[in-house]
Amino acid sequence: MKRLSCLLLGILLVFSLCACQQAAPSSGEAPDQQAITEEATEYFNQMMDGDFETFFNALPQGVQDNISAETIQETWEEEVDKLGGLPENTSPDVSCYVPEHSDQIRVEFVIPCEKGDFKVFINYSPDGSLYN
């Protein structure tokens, strides 16, 4: 009985140590949100000019496997049409933040249109790499 108790306590101790272990430290400093915003703005402006390939080619392979540059462009154009078109000579409101319950970094572009706001989100991983 004593050996069984020691065995159970030993197993409990191992599980406790594993559960209380600190997370592995991040592999570097937090990414520069200004640099991320600038990169995302460049992608956004390219898409505004009709170049969806550059953004698509920068996406992770797993995302590229499930979507195409044409699909991104079609979705963009459908949304613009639904909102009554984009106003001429306008610049988006741009914000960069970490959404609640997420560790991603989001750059949000908003252009007020006739029938609502045209919104584009470009997400980055915590290490600063393009996510989607």
Where are these regions (language model features)?
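Positively charged n-region of N-terminal signal peptides that target proteins for export
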Residues: 1-6
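Repetitive helical segments and hydrophobic/amphipathic motifs
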Residues: 11-12
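C-terminal motif of bacterial Sec signal peptides marking the signal peptidase cleavage site
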Residues: 15-19
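Short, low-complexity N-terminal intrinsically disordered segments enriched in polar/charged residues
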Residues: 20-49
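Short solvent-exposed beta->alpha transition segments
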Residues: 38, 53-104, 113
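Primarily extracytoplasmic ectodomains and periplasmic/lumenal surface modules that are beta-strand-rich
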Residues: 52-53, 129
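Hydrophobic residues positioned within well-ordered beta-strands of beta-sheet architectures
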Residues: 107-109, 120
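Short beta-strand edge/turn micro-motifs at domain boundaries
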Residues: 117-132
